[in-house]
């Protein structure tokens, strides 16, 4: 895995991890700069075991960081996913397609990946819900965001149209 976009971004992710650990998160893997890569914006991919009330569960990271929160059941998982002012993307891992489809329908997120993390396709609309995205980009729906539609009808000639007003002028105006 390559470096982050900048050392500033790496430092921001380090602060997020430090805050999570301060709140009681367990670092399952990663959580620091690689010792052999001292130059640049490198940060190890990190998995944190967290609780729902931790700050990290209510913000966006945009770094190599995955907070994992154990849940009792699908109802709790959906409730936790929706307990956020954000809604860009959600990842679901399951072999139970009935549960997957239920979660896809109930999670308030603009993107949902099921067993296929972060795959993307430029032909599919991309965007979030809530505070992470009004509107869409990419795909046909994304193009529609830049379009202003207008209805225009043009008759090829200026002749009266019997389908629109099928009465001769003499019948219509000599009543």
Predicted regions and their residues:
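General beta-strand structural signal in soluble alpha/beta enzymes
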Residues: 27-30, 114-116
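Short intrinsically disordered, low-complexity coil segments enriched in acidic
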Residues: 1-3, 154
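Short beta-strand to alpha-helix junction loop
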Residues: 3-14
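Conserved C-terminal structural/oligomerization subdomain of aldehyde/semialdehyde dehydrogenase
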Residues: 35, 42-175
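Short, solvent-exposed loop/turn elements at beta->coil junctions and helix N-caps
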Residues: 31-37
